[in-house]
Amino acid sequence: MLFRSILNRQNEARANWISGVSHDIRTPLSMIMGYAGRIAESKAASKSIREQAEIVRKQSVKIKELVQDLNLVSQLEYEMQPLHKEMVRLSKLLRSYVADLLNTGISDSYNIGIKITPDAENAVLECDARLISRAVNNLVQNSMKHNPQGCEVCLSLTASQNHLILAVTDNGMGLPAEKLQELEEKPHYMESTDERLDLRHGLGLLIVQQVAIAHNGTFKLTNVFPKGCEATLIFPYIG
C-alpha cells in the first residue's frame, strides 16, 4: 500500500509538471503565432518576409498541437483526465465525423467510406464522445498522411454480444512486419522518428491507446491482405 501511494504521488507530480509546463508555454506561443500571422498578412512586408513568417506561424501551430497532445497523453496515462461519459450512439458519431471530414475539402486522392452492420446501428456505448472522436481522427489522419499517393479509408462498426468493434482500415502501404512485432512487444512505446507510426508528432498512437484503456477497451494494429493497415478499437459492450 505504501509503495502504491508513493507511486501514485510520483505519477501525479509528473502529470502536474507536464500540465504546468504546457500552461506556461501556451501564452508566449500564442504571441508568436499572433505576430507571425500579422507579418504573414502584412502588405508592408516583402514577399520573402511574409513567406518566412508563415513558416514560423505553421511551425508554432505544430508546437501548440504537440504540447496539447503531450498533456493529454499524460493526463490519460495517469488517470487524471476527467472523462465526460454519456450514452453515445457510435454509428451517429462516426457518420457525423465523416461528414465533417468531407466538408473540410480533403484531396480527391482519398476515398473515405463508412460501413456499419445492422447489429451495430443502434448500439450505444457509455463513453467520452470527444475522446473517441479524437482517437478516430488520429487514425484516419495517419492513414492519409502516410499514403500521400492516396488511398481508400473505411471506418467500420460491428457489434457482438460482448464487444463493439470500431475499425479504421486503409489499402495503403501497410506496416513492416518488424514494426508490428515491436508494437506487440512494446505496446506503449513508439519511436518518434518512425515514419509509418508517427501519428502526429509520435504521440497520436499513444493517445489512441490511452483512450482505449480509459474506456476499458483495447487497441491493435494489423496488416490486411493484399495491402493496407487496420487499426481496431474494441470496447466491452452488452447488447
Can you say where each PLM-predicted feature lies in the sequence?
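Short helix-loop "hinge" at the ATP-lid/N-box region of the Bergerat-fold HATPase_c
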Residues: S143-M144
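Short alpha-helical segment of the dimerization/phosphotransfer core of two-component systems
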Residues: K58-I63
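Short conserved segment of the HATPase_c
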Residues: L175-E191
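Conserved phosphoacceptor histidine of two-component systems
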Residues: S19-H23
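Conserved micro-motifs of the catalytic ATP-binding
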Residues: Y78-L83, V124-C127
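Acidic ATP/Mg2+-coordinating residue in the GHKL
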Residues: D170
